[in-house]
């Protein structure tokens, strides 16, 4: 069964959503992060909560550590955190604070030797966030181009004990227009590492279609704030 991971994105300790990762598209969510934690925690079908420090992702260092540490105390659900994680000490600090999994993006993509070291040090607890426009990978809060192809890059990661690869189609993110099913399905076939889909998810039908592609988990952003998404789920 595909896992459901509702998302909380933070700017200045406020729960927000962006469209296509553009910081000038910031939209404050109706629920605070604390309220979202409580809301998501009531559902047995929620396997973990996905938290991102958006300013950390852009500024290249974690900005919301203390606030995220306070959120950790509000739920027994697993929590994964990403955004600005660039060092082993940051990862260890998050784990010491009770965070279950850490997400690395830019650092892991630009330094695969470091990524391998972290994954072997914390097997199954490190997730790599791979964000792309089409097949072109972006880094540093989605603001910097790379010359890396999504599939070529992911294929070289097969021997690394990552918890999974979080794939975000930037063009879909925040739009609730549906995930990029085609590229997501191709990515699942290109790697033995579990693939987590993020970006554009609207409703349970999208989840069911992702499940049919053997996607391991789905990260739900804006849709998770709508009661209609959770109808019939426990």
Swiss-Prot record:
<dbReference type="InterPro" id="IPR011060">
    <property type="entry name" value="RibuloseP-bd_barrel"/>
</dbReference>
<dbReference type="GO" id="GO:0005737">
    <property type="term" value="C:cytoplasm"/>
</dbReference>
<dbReference type="InterPro" id="IPR044524">
    <property type="entry name" value="Isoase_HisA-like"/>
</dbReference>
<keyword id="KW-0368">Histidine biosynthesis</keyword>
<dbReference type="GO" id="GO:0003949">
    <property type="term" value="F:1-(5-phosphoribosyl)-5-[(5-phosphoribosylamino)methylideneamino]imidazole-4-carboxamide isomerase activity"/>
</dbReference>
<comment type="similarity">
    <text>Belongs to the HisA/HisF family.</text>
</comment>
<comment type="pathway">
    <text>Amino-acid biosynthesis; L-histidine biosynthesis; L-histidine from 5-phospho-alpha-D-ribose 1-diphosphate: step 4/9.</text>
</comment>
<dbReference type="GO" id="GO:0000162">
    <property type="term" value="P:L-tryptophan biosynthetic process"/>
</dbReference>
<feature type="active site" description="Proton donor">
    <location>
        <position position="131"/>
    </location>
</feature>
<keyword id="KW-0963">Cytoplasm</keyword>
<protein>
    <recommendedName>
        <fullName>1-(5-phosphoribosyl)-5-[(5-phosphoribosylamino)methylideneamino] imidazole-4-carboxamide isomerase</fullName>
        <ecNumber>5.3.1.16</ecNumber>
    </recommendedName>
</protein>
<dbReference type="InterPro" id="IPR013785">
    <property type="entry name" value="Aldolase_TIM"/>
</dbReference>
<dbReference type="InterPro" id="IPR006062">
    <property type="entry name" value="His_biosynth"/>
</dbReference>
<keyword id="KW-0028">Amino-acid biosynthesis</keyword>
<dbReference type="GO" id="GO:0000105">
    <property type="term" value="P:L-histidine biosynthetic process"/>
</dbReference>
<keyword id="KW-0413">Isomerase</keyword>
<dbReference type="InterPro" id="IPR006063">
    <property type="entry name" value="HisA_bact_arch"/>
</dbReference>
<dbReference type="InterPro" id="IPR023016">
    <property type="entry name" value="Isoase_HisA-like_bact"/>
</dbReference>
<dbReference type="Pfam" id="PF00977">
    <property type="entry name" value="His_biosynth"/>
</dbReference>
<feature type="active site" description="Proton acceptor">
    <location>
        <position position="9"/>
    </location>
</feature>
């Amino acid at each position: 069964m595909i896992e459901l991971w509702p998302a909380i994105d933070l700017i200045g300790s406020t729960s927000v959503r962006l469209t296509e990762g553009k910081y000038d598209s910031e939209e404050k969510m109706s629920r605070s992060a604390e309220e979202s934690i409580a809301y998501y925690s009531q559902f047995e079908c929620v396997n973990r909560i996905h938290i991102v420090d958006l300013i950390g992702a852009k500024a290249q260092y974690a900005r919301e550590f203390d606030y995220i540490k306070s959120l950790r105390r509000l739920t027994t659900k697993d929590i994964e955190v990403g955004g600005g994680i660039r060092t082993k000490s940051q990862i260890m600090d998050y784990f010491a604070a009770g965070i279950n999994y850490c997400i690395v993006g830019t650092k892991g993509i630009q330094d695969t030797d470091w990524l391998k070291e972290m994954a072997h040090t914390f097997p199954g607890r490190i997730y790599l966030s791979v964000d792309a426009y089409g097949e072109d990978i972006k880094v540093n809060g989605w603001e910097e181009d790379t010359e890396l192809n999504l599939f070529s890059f992911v294929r070289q990661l097969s021997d690394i004990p990552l918890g999974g690869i979080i794939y975000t189609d930037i063009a879909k993110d925040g739009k609730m227009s549906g995930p990029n099913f085609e590229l997501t399905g191709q990515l699942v076939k290109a790697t033995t590492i579990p693939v987590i889909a993020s970006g554009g998810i609207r409703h349970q039908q999208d989840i069911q279609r992702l499940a049919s592609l053997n996607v391991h988990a789905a990260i739900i952003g804006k849709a998770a704030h709508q009661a209609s998404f959770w109808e019939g789920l426990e």
